[in-house]
C-alpha cells in the first residue's frame, strides 16, 4: 500500500503498487461489519460484469475475516467538479463533447442484458483522464428491474431527478435528467437550482434547449434515452463545426496609396494559409505591384 486516496461511508480507497506487474492499483477496503456491506458486494458485481472504456476495470475481489477488498484499475485524472471549478465553466463545445461521452457510458449500462441505472450522476463521480471521462463510485447503481422496489432513494441534490425523492418508479430517464444537470453545471459552473435558468443568446439557445429536454419534471417529456440525447448533442457538435468552418471576409483598406495596405493583406493571407486556414486574396483593382509582391513573398 502506498497511500490513502480517499474515504467515505462505504470504505477507504488506497493506492497500491503491484510489485510483479509494476503497475498501480486502487484498492477499496470495506469492513464486513459495515451496514452498507451489501452495497459494496453489489458494486463489485456491477464492475465485474461491465466492460467499457469509461468504466474502471476490476481485477479481483479478496476478503479476510474482517474486511473485503475490491482491487481495480487506478485512474489518474481530475474530477469533473474540480475541472469546472478551476476553469469557472466550459464552452458549449467542450461541455457537449463531455456530455456525449457521458451518454455513451450511461447508454451502455442502460442497455445491458440486465439493464443498470446509475442513479447518482454528479461531477465528483466523473474523472477526466487526458480528455476521456471515466465513471466512478457505483454505490447507488441498481438493476433496472429492481429500481422501482428500491426503498431508500439516493441522489445528489441538484442532480437527482424528482422521482428519486417522490418514490415514483425509476428508469433510464432518471439518468437522463442527471446528464442534463451535468450539462448545466459544466456550462455555468454551478448546479441547477430548483428552477434552472436558461439563456436566450444565440450561442447558448440550442444547448440550453437540450438541457431543458433532459430536466423536465415529467419523465415522458424528457429525452427517452441517453442514446437519443447523444444524437442531439452530436447534431449540436456538427452545427458548431460548420459554423467554425464558415468563410469570413476580412477587408484591408488604406487611407492613401503607398502605406503598405497591399503588403499587409498579402502577408496575412500567407500566414493564415501556412497555419492551416486557407485564405484567398482578392484585390478590388489590378496592379502590377500586387503580382510583384506576391512573387517576392512566394505566394502564387
What are these regions (language model features)?
Residues 61:
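Activation-segment/catalytic-loop signature of the eukaryotic protein kinase fold
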Residues 202-217:
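Conserved C-terminal C-lobe helix
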Residues 104-116:
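Protein kinase catalytic-loop region centered on the HRD/HxD motif
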Residues 251-300:
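Walker A/P-loop NTP-binding active-site region of P-loop NTPases
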Residues 80-90:
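AlphaC helix of the protein kinase catalytic domain
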Residues 31-49:
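AlphaC helix of the eukaryotic protein kinase fold
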Residues 98-99:
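Activation segment signature within eukaryotic-like protein kinase domains
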Residues 65-79:
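Conserved short submotifs of the Hanks-type protein kinase catalytic core
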Amino acid at each position: 500500500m502506498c497511500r490513502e486516496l480517499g474515504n467515505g461511508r462505504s470504505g477507504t480507497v488506497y493506492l497500491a503498487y503491484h510489485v510483479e506487474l509494476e503497475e498501480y492499483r486502487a484498492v477499496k477496503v470495506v469492513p464486513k461489519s459495515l451496514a452498507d456491506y451489501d452495497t459494496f458486494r453489489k458494486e463489485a458485481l456491477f464492475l465485474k460484469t461491465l466492460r467499457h472504456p469509461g468504466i474502471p476495470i476490476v481485477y479481483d475481489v479478496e476478503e479476510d475475516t474482517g474486511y473485503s477488498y475490491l482491487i481495480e484499475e487506478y485512474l489518474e485524472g481530475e474530477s469533473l467538479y474540480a475541472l469546472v471549478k478551476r476553469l469557472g465553466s466550459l464552452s458549449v463545445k467542450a461541455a457537449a463533447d463531455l456530455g456525449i461521452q457521458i451518454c455513451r457510458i450511461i447508454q451502455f449500462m442502460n442497455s445491458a442484458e440486465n439493464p443498470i441505472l446509475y442513479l447518482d450522476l454528479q461531477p465528483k463521480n466523473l474523472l477526466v483522464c487526458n480528455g476521456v471521462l471515466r465513471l466512478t463510485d457505483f454505490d447507488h447503481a441498481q438493476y433496472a428491474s429492481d429500481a422501482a422496489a428500491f426503498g431508500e432513494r439516493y441522489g445528489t441534490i441538484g442532480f437527482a431527478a424528482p422521482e428519486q425523492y417522490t418514490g415514483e418508479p425509476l428508469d433510464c430517464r432518471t439518468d437522463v435528467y442527471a446528464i442534463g444537470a451535468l450539462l448545466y453545471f459544466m456550462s455555468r459552473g454551478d448546479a441547477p437550482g430548483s428552477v434552472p435558468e436558461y439563456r436566450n443568446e444565440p450561442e447558448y439557445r440550442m444547448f440550453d434547449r437540450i438541457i431543458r429536454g433532459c430536466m423536465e419534471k415529467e419523465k415522458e417529456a424528457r429525452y427517452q434515452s441517453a442514446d437519443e440525447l447523444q444524437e442531439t448533442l452530436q447534431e449540436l457538435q456538427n452545427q458548431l463545426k460548420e459554423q467554425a468552418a464558415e468563410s469570413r471576409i476580412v477587408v484591408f483598406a488604406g487611407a492613401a496609396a503607398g502605406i503598405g495596405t497591399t503588403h499587409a493583406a498579402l502577408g496575412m493571407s500567407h500566414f493564415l494559409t501556412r497555419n492551416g486556414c486557407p485564405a484567398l486574396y482578392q484585390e478590388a483593382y489590378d496592379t502590377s505591384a500586387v503580382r510583384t509582391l506576391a512573387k517576392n513573398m512566394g505566394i502564387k
